[in-house]
């Protein structure tokens, strides 16, 4: 995804580890998702694809912090420019839970709560072989799938 997007625009990646790439349109900086190095309302587009569910669990060298995921979401909301977009994807299931040393799974309702203050533009659910709507997802009997969400910040 990042390499594809970098063909269209400059990408700035923030991670606890420096990203090594030869692509000139990807700039990497070391940082913490719970304390982003940007001013309020300054970033037009943010994405977190299979990242925020890990924050605070220590799996990738970060500090243990039960509220790490929410802190990262709050930081994304803080730096997002008005009318900007946040694209996020992470495990979504029927129950909220932490899978030890792996990831968090959130219900769709918890997702809406965590991103309160932003407007939900679209949501889809990724299965291994297709992308489905919320209505279709609600009919499934699966422990979890990947929720894909598009939010914006209104004035």
Role assignments for model-derived ranges:
Residues 47, 52, 56:
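A conserved beta-strand element that flanks and buttresses the S-adenosyl-L-methionine
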């Amino acid at each position: 995804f990042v390499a594809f997007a970098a063909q269209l625009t400059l990408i700035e990646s923030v991670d606890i580890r420096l990203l090594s790439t030869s692509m000139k349109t990807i700039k990497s900086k070391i940082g913490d998702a719970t304390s982003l190095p940007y001013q309020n309302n300054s970033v037009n587009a943010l994405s977190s694809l299979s990242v925020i569910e890990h924050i605070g669990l220590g799996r990738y060298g970060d500090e243990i912090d039960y509220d790490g995921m929410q802190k990262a979401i709050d930081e994304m909301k803080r730096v997002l420019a008005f009318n900007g977009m946040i694209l996020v994807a992470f495990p979504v299931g029927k129950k909220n839970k932490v899978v030890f040393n792996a990831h968090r799974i959130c219900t769709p309702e918890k997702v809406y709560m965590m991103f309160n203050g932003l407007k939900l533009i679209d949501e889809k659910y990724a299965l291994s072989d297709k992308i489905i709507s919320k209505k279709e997802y609600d009919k499934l009997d699966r422990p979890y799938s990947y929720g894909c969400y598009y939010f914006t910040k209104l004035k």
